[in-house]
Curated annotation (Swiss-Prot):
InterPro entries: Fibro_Slime, PA14/GLEYA, PA14_dom, Prespore-cell_inducing_factor
Segments forming domain PA14: 119-261
Keywords for this protein: Glycoprotein, Membrane, Signal, Transmembrane, Transmembrane helix
Source organism of the structure: Dictyostelium discoideum
Predominant location category: membrane
Any one annotated GO CC term: membrane
Ranges per topology, Cytoplasmic: 680-719
Transmembrane stretches, start-end: 659-679
Name of this chain's protein: Protein psiI
Annotated Pfam families: PA14
Tagged with keyword Coiled coil: no
Family: Belongs to the prespore-cell-inducing factor family.
Signal peptide: 1-19
Entry-listed glycosylation sites: N62, N105, N118, N151, N315, N379, N454, N488, N500, N538, N592, N629
Length: 719
């Protein structure tokens, strides 16, 4: 009775506030994917017996695949031989899907299956435990749904002995976590992307303990926790995990698998086949949200088969009947409406043409074409070309090009001179002394009298005015018998070099090189051995390169065309951006959070992920961290809340004493009444009927039998 009286006094002094309490979880789920393996498809499984082998994998995890990477792919290194990596190249399929590989020898085919490992709280230590010395989680699953594959036993009973388990999670470091493991075969654990447990190879059960306080982690910061386990050999399979790490899954794929890639519920061959041999069918990206009313098949991706370019004269496209890239000759455009005639295709330049509107075809051609007709030089064009003298008449001769004749032609009377003044013809009568000197003229001459030294008028014939056409690029000729005047184009300029009607020299004429291809320069240049001989270069044009954010290509019809540079990302967390001077650079991907209690981070394997913020409590063994979102007046915050009921490790010793009682918080007078009047049975009845499960308290210290022989008055109910 004295003990009960003391308890009454102590309980009356306790002020217990239950509104800020929470219940400690009794289970911890580690969610991942297990990959069923079969030795015929991967001879790294069921090789000859091996031993524990460290340094098989690199110290840093592959952050893109979130899987380990072998230190070497050479099969005959000491570590690979000891670790029984018979075919190291197949290690990539230990923890990554290869479901559609052919079912042939060493193809690496595997079968992914979602897997959850449930750890149970040990309230006396505050750790979560999974202990299974008979660990065969996928018997009759994966490949083994087919009896053909059930041919491995432990001597008597069938089991699926060949599988690899991958668990990718995160946790918020609280400051005192531990992780213990015992099992076989390969086991690798990465924390903060660094290897902390290295138990590779085929071996008997082996263990390793990790105290996270030795890893240099920062309290209240999120870290990655990645666990990899393989069973590669008969006849045992054991595993024991004990940890206080509160691991959680920050991302689920559309199959509902933690850190999944969609492979457990989407098979591109089954779910995404569109029947088109010229598309590459793939499952939706792992972070795809499947809207209500839609199926996975509705969101599959179908990328066109890309066929490599051969040359400018060949189209290499996918044949819809065979699914193979098939080269065919390109069909060049009909450009007759542009007065262009097709030439043989050039592999480096593509379709080439010759213009029928060059001066070689007709010296009166301007080089322009309208509706399939070459445009010729007009009289005004020739006038401008030859000097535009108002006292001359200009026109274009199909044999000679631009020519001119006097506006005011001389008549038969040599004493009547037809004079032109600013385009106006007038007849001027000459004195017979200067115009009648007995000239005997041929058909190409005109009368001209000059005064001899003796003062007499003598004949000095001149060429007819119309013989000179004013074009220095023609050779003018008159037949003295018939008077026929001709103007022949000079032959000193050859090729694309044409005579300049102003200077009479040979000048390059680019129009003569027009090939109908906007990707060639169509430039006339002088030959190395003869400056009067022009040669067309027709070199491929160089498109601008000044703006590094534009990529130029040449279209044979349009010329240089540009499109924005698409800068590639580096992984999922480095975004490619373009600077017009520097070109492509990388910047970190920004993941925006919409609330204080939602964390948005970039995960290299996935991209932006959003998950609930985990708060680190002041005392992780006895408290839970609770996140409180911001309000209009208060910022978001984390707070620590006591577990209710208190875990046993947060209570005092089992024997009742004043010090013990003073440190134990009991939930109100109801508990006290139950304890006093009903003893242990009354307390148990109260505990079993509470709204919040008393899951984490296996014992009441007030009701523990004394280990030193002393009597605990509350251990038994009054008789």
């Amino acid at each position: 009775m004295k003990i009960i009286f003391n308890l009454l006094i102590l309980f009356s002094l306790v002020n217990f506030i239950n509104s800020q309490s929470t219940t400690q979880a009794t289970t911890l789920k580690l969610e991942g994917t297990i990959y069923d393996q079969y030795p015929y498809y991967d001879n790294n499984f069921e090789p000859i017996a091996g031993s524990l082998t460290t340094r098989l994998v690199q110290n840093a995890i592959n952050t893109t695949t979130r899987t380990p990477t072998l230190n070497t792919l050479l099969p005959f290194t000491t570590t690979n031989v000891m670790g029984r990596m018979v075919t190291p190249s197949l290690f990539q399929y230990f923890y990554q899907p290869n479901k559609n590989a052919p079912l042939t020898n060493n193809s690496g085919a595997n079968f992914p299956i979602p897997m959850t490992v449930n750890l149970t709280l040990n309230p006396s230590t505050g750790t979560y435990v999974y202990d299974n010395q008979f660990f065969f989680p996928i018997d009759y699953q994966g490949f083994d749904t087919n009896p053909f594959y059930r041919n491995y036993t432990d001597g008597t009973d069938y089991h699926n002995f060949h599988f690899c388990l991958k668990i990718n999670t995160r946790f918020t470091y609280t400051g005192n976590e531990v992780f213990y493991f015992v099992g076989d075969d390969d086991v690798w654990v990465f924390i903060n992307d660094q290897l902390v447990i290295d138990l590779g190879g085929l071996h008997e059960a082996a263990g390793k303990n990790i105290d996270l306080t030795t890893l240099g982690l920062t309290k209240n910061k999120d870290y990655t926790f990645d666990f990899f386990y393989c069973e590669r050999h008969t006849t045992k399979s054991t595993i024991r995990i004990e940890t206080s790490i509160q691991a959680y899954c920050p991302f689920y794929d559309y199959c509902g698998v933690c850190y999944g890639d969609g492979s457990t519920c989407c098979d591109p061959v089954v779910n995404c086949n569109d029947g088109d041999l010229c598309t590459i069918d793939s499952c939706p990206p792992r972070d795809t949200i499947i809207p209500a009313g839609f199926s996975i098949s509705d969101l599959c991706q179908h990328a066109p088969v890309s066929c490599p370019s051969i040359d400018m004269c060949t189209n290499n496209t996918c044949d819809s009947k065979s699914g193979q890239c098939t080269p065919t000759s390109i069909k060049c455009d009909d450009k007759s409406s542009q007065c262009l005639t097709l030439k043989p295709c050039d592999p480096s330049s593509g379709c080439l043409y010759t213009s029928s509107c060059t001066s070689a075809h007709n010296p009166c051609n301007t080089g322009a074409c309208s509706n399939g007709q070459c445009q010729t030089k007009s009289n005004s064009t020739c006038a401008a070309e030859l000097g535009n003298d108002p006292c001359k008449v200009y026109y274009c001769d199909i044999n000679s090009g631009c020519v001119s004749q006097p506006l005011c032609k001389q008549g038969p009377d040599s004493c009547e001179q037809n004079v032109c003044n600013a385009g106006v013809c007038t007849i001027k009568k000459l004195d017979p002394s200067v115009c009648s000197c007995g000239c005997v003229l041929n058909k190409c001459q005109k009368n001209n009298c000059v005064t001899a030294s003796n003062g007499t008028s003598v004949c000095s014939p001149l060429p007819l005015d119309e013989i000179d056409d004013g074009n220095p690029c023609t050779d003018d000729h008159c037949d003295e018998t018939t008077g026929l005047i001709t103007h022949n184009i000079t032959t000193k300029c050859t090729g694309c070099m044409k005579c300049n009607t102003t200077t009479g020299s040979c000048s390059p004429t680019n129009n003569e090189c027009q090939d109908g291809n906007e990707c060639t320069d169509n430039i006339c240049v002088a030959a190395a051995t003869n400056i009067n001989q022009g040669e067309c270069s027709n070199k491929t044009v160089s498109c601008p390169t000044t703006d590094k954010c534009l990529v130029y290509t040449c279209d044979t019809n349009k010329g240089c065309v540009s499109k924005p540079v698409v800068c590639p990302n580096s992984g999922n967390c480095q975004v490619g951006v373009c600077d017009s001077v520097k070109g492509c650079t990388l910047v970190p991907r920004v993941c925006n959070s919409t609330a204080f209690c939602l964390v948005s981070q970039c995960d290299e394997a996935i991209g932006c992920i959003t998950f609930e913020k985990r708060c680190s409590p002041d005392n992780s063994k006895c408290q839970s961290g609770v996140c409180v979102n911001a309000t209009a007046t208060e910022p978001g915050k984390c707070k620590s809340v006591d577990y209710d009921p208190k875990p046993f490790i947060c209570q005092t010793g089992a024997i009742v004493s004043t010090a013990v009682v003073a440190s134990v918080v009991v939930v109100g007078a109801v508990v006290l009444g139950a304890a006093i009047f009903a003893g242990k049975k009354g307390y148990d009845h109260w505990k079993a009927n509470q709204g919040q499960v008393f899951a984490s308290s296996n014992a009441n210290p007030l009701y523990q039998q004394s280990n030193n022989g002393g009597e605990n008055a509350l251990f038994e109910a009054p008789q």
